[in-house]
Design a protein with these regions (language model features):
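Acidic, Mg2+-coordinating phosphoryl-transfer loop and its flanking beta/alpha structural elements
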Residues: 170-210
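Active-site neighborhood of HAD-like aspartate-dependent phosphohydrolases
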Residues: 1-41, 53-55
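Non-catalytic pre-domain segments flanking phosphatase-related domains
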Residues: 1-4, 56-60, 167, 221, ...
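Substrate-recognition/cap helix-loop segment adjacent to the acidic, metal-dependent catalytic center
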Residues: 26-28, 52, 56, 98-109, ...
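Short, acidic loop-to-helix structural element flanking the phosphoryl-transfer center
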Residues: 3, 70, 78-110, 116, ...
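Short acidic-hydrophobic, aromatic-tinged amphipathic segments that line or gate anion-handling sites
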Residues: 136, 208-214
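A short, structured active-site edge motif that brings together acidic residues
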Residues: 36-41, 64-70, 129-143
Length: 225
């Protein structure tokens, strides 16, 4: 089971997701500054919205979070198509990795903090949404290890084996991806295509770390450990 993170791993969006969140807080609460003081790296959408609400002193009830996420997804559709191609792209080696996974009988899915609709919106912009038919998403759980577990369960189900018998590999670009993999007993392949260097990702405990998946040995590690 291969579970790919989206932001900073599969693709870079040029900040489209952050801009959509900023606009959502601005239109609903008049507070474009709600998320100014923290990084979104490795966070789930629900956790981002919850922390943003706390920053501006609004009670983070589930219904409040849901309403803001609905507005965010609407605005995200606009933001991803406003971004130019030079800033919105698929990272090196990712298409080859996805294709290799499918060709070798892997269950190839997503392991992302994005809510499902937001995930598909981001991937549709670069026409790779149809390569993934399952995953663990930010609307499965607010905590990354739990949504990764849900994605792994779905992948094992597709393979027709119990989760305990499946080799699960999480592909991500932050220590939080690595830690989520560790929490469920999965392997991790970390890529330095986001805000962290390969050394940082090794230090976090990654099973393997590469500058990107086009590097020698990366696809072999993905498929065979």
């Amino acid at each position: 089971v291969l579970l790919f993170d989206i932001d900073g791993t599969l693709i870079t969006t040029g900040g489209a997701g952050r801009q959509a969140i900023v606009r959502a807080f601005s239109t609903v609460y008049g507070r474009p500054d709600a998320c100014d003081h923290f990084s979104f790296g490795g966070m789930t959408d629900r956790a981002i919205v919850r922390l943003g609400l706390e920053q501006i002193g609004v009670a983070a009830a589930d219904a409040t979070i849901d309403a803001l996420l609905t507005r965010y997804v609407e605005l995200l559709e606009e933001e991803v198509w406003k971004m130019d191609d030079a800033r919105y792209r698929v990272h090196a080696g990712m298409l080859e990795a996805i294709d290799a996974g499918h060709a070798n009988g892997c269950a190839v899915g997503l392991g992302t903090g994005n809510v499902r609709t937001g995930a598909m919106t981001k991937l549709r912009r670069v026409r790779i949404h149809e390569r993934f038919d399952f995953g663990g998403f930010g609307d499965d759980h607010e905590l990354r290890p739990e949504l990764i577990r849900r994605g792994a369960e779905r992948g094992a189900q597709k393979l027709g084996v119990p989760l305990a018998e499946a080799r699960v590999v999480v592909i991500g670009d932050t220590p939080k991806d690595v830690q989520a993999a560790q929490a469920i007993g999965a392997e991790s392949i970390a890529v330095a295509t986001g805000d962290y260097r390969a050394d940082d990702l090794w230090a976090a405990g990654a099973t393997h770390a590469f500058e990107d998946l086009s590097r020698p040995g990366a696809i072999e590690a993905l498929l065979n450990g």
